[in-house]
């Protein structure tokens, strides 16, 4: 079954500690998995901050400053690209928390990783994202 791109385009995005860039702050393992190669030149066409257009859906992004897996610069680069393209966006960077914080509470905690995964200040991201989505789709 083939659907036109407009029929499968998301209406909005929620990106949590996302892998965005194939550049200096890349998470190389993700690009290796995506492309099947370690060739950095093959990664570049997939660098999302370079693919943002005014048609990119409104985007909510969040990250933690201390994410040791995916550098926070990924979120910051995407935020700048969205701003430059005039795409509505909301961005939050919480001061601490490792990669995969998820809900930041006991519900999504991995036993033994409480210091990295229990991040009370980040638990509000779901409420913030819901408010952003409501604002995008509420007619004024």
Q: Could you tell me what each predicted segment is?
A:
Residues 73-140:
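C-terminal catalytic histidine-bearing segment of alpha/beta-hydrolase fold enzymes
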Residues 26, 71-74:
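Residues at alpha-helix caps and immediate loop-helix transition turns in enzyme cores, especially N-
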Residues 1-30, 39-44, 48, 135:
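Primarily recognizes the serine-hydrolase "nucleophile elbow" in alpha/beta-hydrolase
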Residues 48-56:
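Conserved serine/cysteine hydrolase catalytic core
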Residues 16-19, 63-65, 94-97:
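Active-site-proximal beta-strand/loop segments in catalytic clefts of secreted hydrolases
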Residues 9-12, 56-59, 85-90:
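Loop/turn elements at helix/coil->beta-strand transitions in domains of secreted/extracellular proteins
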Residues 55, 60-63, 67:
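Short beta-strand/loop motif that positions the catalytic acidic residue
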Residues 22, 66-70:
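Acidic catalytic loop of the alpha/beta-hydrolase fold
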């Amino acid at each position: 079954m083939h659907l036109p791109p407009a029929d499968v385009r998301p209406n909005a995005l929620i990106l949590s500690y996302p892998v965005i860039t194939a550049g200096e702050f890349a998470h190389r393992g993700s690009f290796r998995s995506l492309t099947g190669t370690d060739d950095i030149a093959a990664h570049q066409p997939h660098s999302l901050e370079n693919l943002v257009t005014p048609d990119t859906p409104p985007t909510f992004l969040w990250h933690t400053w201390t994410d040791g897996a995916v550098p926070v610069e990924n979120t910051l680069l995407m935020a700048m690209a969205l701003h430059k393209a005039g795409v509505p966006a909301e961005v939050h960077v919480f001061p601490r928390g490792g990669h995969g914080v998820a809900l930041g509470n006991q519900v999504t905690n991995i036993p033994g990783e409480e210091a990295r995964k229990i991040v009370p200040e980040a638990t509000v991201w779901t409420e913030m994202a819901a408010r952003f989505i409501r604002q995008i789709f509420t007619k004024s």
